[in-house]
């Protein structure tokens, strides 16, 4: 059973969450987990001035995702920071290149899931995940979120990202806040949950 985690990260917040999602998925017996980043669209000079170029060196080793690899997966988990309540342009550009897969029905029946990050507590976590779900539904994917059996998302003793739609982190207006341990654990849960469901579907189809 193969799980692909496709993400975009500018300053490392989503990368850290992606690592946690991958860790959770790998905890499921038989799971083969791959981590991939979508191509960057921002010019190098802009990345350098913003400090993102340096931050991205931490995950420069992660292979770049290609749309033709997606049909190989049984589950695909997408990670994107929010941009005005929607997925980032880099992820939108990547998904907009999957028209050929849609024509062939290549992703129909595969498990799809989404996690995100925002600058503020109410900065578009839910709308970003839900709007990304629309694309996955057009592809015929089976959506999986973060159920309330992950009790940590109900905590009231700290500021947290995350909702039933998927794990999330709050980066802060200046990007200085990295994912908390609770947010990391929620991301692990989502990865494990997705992999368990994908594994059950694969076994069921083989029966």
From Swiss-Prot:
Which residues are noted in the entry as NAD(+)-binding? 11
Q: Name one GO cellular component term.
A: membrane
Q: Which residues bind FMN?
A: 9-14, 82-84, 117-123, 138
The coenzyme or cofactor needed here is: FMN
Q: How is the cofactor bound?
A: Binds 1 FMN per monomer.
Recorded GO MF terms:
flavin adenine dinucleotide binding; FMN binding; NAD binding; NADH:ubiquinone reductase (non-electrogenic) activity; NADP binding; NADPH dehydrogenase (quinone) activity
Binding residues for substrate: 102
Which EC number(s) does the record attach to this protein? 1.6.5.2
The UniProt record lists the Flavodoxin-like domain at 3-194
Query: Which chemical reaction does it catalyze?
Result: a quinone + NADH + H(+) = a quinol + NAD(+); a quinone + NADPH + H(+) = a quinol + NADP(+)
Assigned keywords, A-Z: Flavoprotein, FMN, NAD, NADP, Nucleotide-binding, Oxidoreductase
A Pfam family hit: FMN_red
Tell me the Gene3D superfamilies matching this sequence.
3.40.50.360
- Please give the family membership noted in the entry: Belongs to the WrbA family.
Record NCBIfam families: flav_wrbA, PRK03767.1
Designated name of the protein: NAD(P)H dehydrogenase (quinone)
